[in-house]
Every structure is written in C-alpha cells, then in structure tokens.
C-alpha cells in the first residue's frame, strides 16, 4: 500500500496497531511536546493543536514525506481529561465518568513536508458508561491500565465492560479514527 514514506508521530502502541491493521506501511517517531490546554481553548481545538504540533515537530527531526500526529482526550461535564497524573486522579476521573455520557475527541493531523501542507481534523465519539461501584473502579485502577489513557480507561481492554454504548467511531475511542485517517491519507496521495 506504500506510495511514500509515512511517519506516525506517536509512541502509542494502540495507534501503531490500528494504523498497521489497515495495511498502511509507516515508520514511528515519537513526539515529545507539552500537552497543556491554552486557557479558553475548545476541546476539539486543543486536540487538533496537539496533533498538529506532534506532526510538525516530528517532521523537523526525522526523514519522511507525510507525518501523522494524533491526540485523544476525554471531555466530561466540560472537563478535559487527559492521562491521569496518579492513581487518585484515575479514581476521580472514573467516578466522574460513572453512569454518564462523555465525549472522546481525537484530533489528528497529516503534515506533507514536500508540499508544506497540513490537514487537521477532530473526530468526536459519544460514550456512555454504566454506573460503576467503587470496588470496580479500585480494581481497575490497581491493574495499572488507566495510567497512560485519556480519561483513565481503555475501551479495548479491561474497561470494555464499563461501556454501555457508543455513538461514533470505536477506533476513535481507542486512539485513532482509522476510517477518517486512512481516507484522508488516500485523498492526499499518501496511499
């Protein structure tokens, strides 16, 4: 499927697995940018800004033609939830998500170094959690799984049973809206 050199600007094993599952050939070069929202920044703008910054920063330090950056956040009752800072934060996040609807937003960006072109989009999926008991939350947090996940959960892992329903892209909740990303890569000539 390769037409040019695509670089995934992410260390996320979930993004790597998703992109590879679509038959896309790519290299990986993790980006390291600050992930702090600007005061007043809308959640989708925050996620797409981080995705753009990851793609462009990676392009500045490695070879390639197209650079794909992505960032996933969870938004619940107006709070942007990134990765928990510690176990207590993970417990707090899961308690807040318990029994309510929230949004998972993944911003993604594709930077074309040759044309100096940039495509940025955000994909939103609505997720509803079942009401969670404190012992369920404690047991899940004790696994360590929530610690590197936005909103402190992985739909594809131990938290799958917590999800009553989703409206939108499942792969977006995992960390990369695969349908949209692959279609955009095709549309711009990367695939």
Curated annotation (Swiss-Prot):
Site description Important for substrate specificity, residues in chain: 14, 72, 156
Taxonomic superkingdom: Bacteria
EC number: 3.6.1.9
Keywords, ordered alphabetically: Cytoplasm, Hydrolase, Nucleotide metabolism
Catalytic residues identified in the record: 71 (proton acceptor)
Subcellular location: Cytoplasm
GO molecular function per UniProt: dTTP diphosphatase activity; nucleoside triphosphate diphosphatase activity; UTP diphosphatase activity
Main location: cytoplasm
Family: Belongs to the Maf family. YhdE subfamily.
Matching HAMAP family: Maf
Name this protein carries in UniProt: dTTP/UTP pyrophosphatase
Source species: Geobacter sulfurreducens (strain ATCC 51573 / DSM 12127 / PCA)
């Amino acid at each position: 499927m390769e037409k040019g050199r695509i670089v995934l600007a992410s260390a996320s094993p979930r993004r790597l697995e998703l992109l590879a599952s679509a038959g896309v050939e790519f290299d990986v070069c993790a980006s390291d940018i600050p992930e702090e929202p600007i005061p007043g920044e809308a959640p989708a703008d925050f996620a797409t800004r981080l995705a753009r910054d990851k793609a462009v920063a990676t392009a500045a330090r490695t070879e390639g033609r197209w650079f794909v950056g992505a960032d996933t956040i969870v938004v619940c009752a107006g709070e942007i939830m990134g990765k928990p800072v510690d176990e207590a934060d993970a417990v707090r996040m899961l308690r807040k998500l318990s029994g309510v609807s929230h949004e998972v937003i993944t911003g993604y960006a594709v930077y074309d170094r040759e044309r100096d072109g940039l495509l940025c989009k955000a994909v939103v999926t609505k997720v509803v959690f079942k009401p969670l008991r404190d012992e369920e939350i404690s047991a899940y947090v004790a696994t360590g799984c929530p610690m590197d996940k936005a909103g402190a959960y992985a739909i594809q892992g131990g938290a799958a049973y917590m999800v009553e329903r989703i409206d939108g892209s499942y792969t977006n909740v995992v960390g990369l809206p695969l349908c949209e990303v692959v279609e955009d890569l095709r549309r711009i000539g990367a695939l």
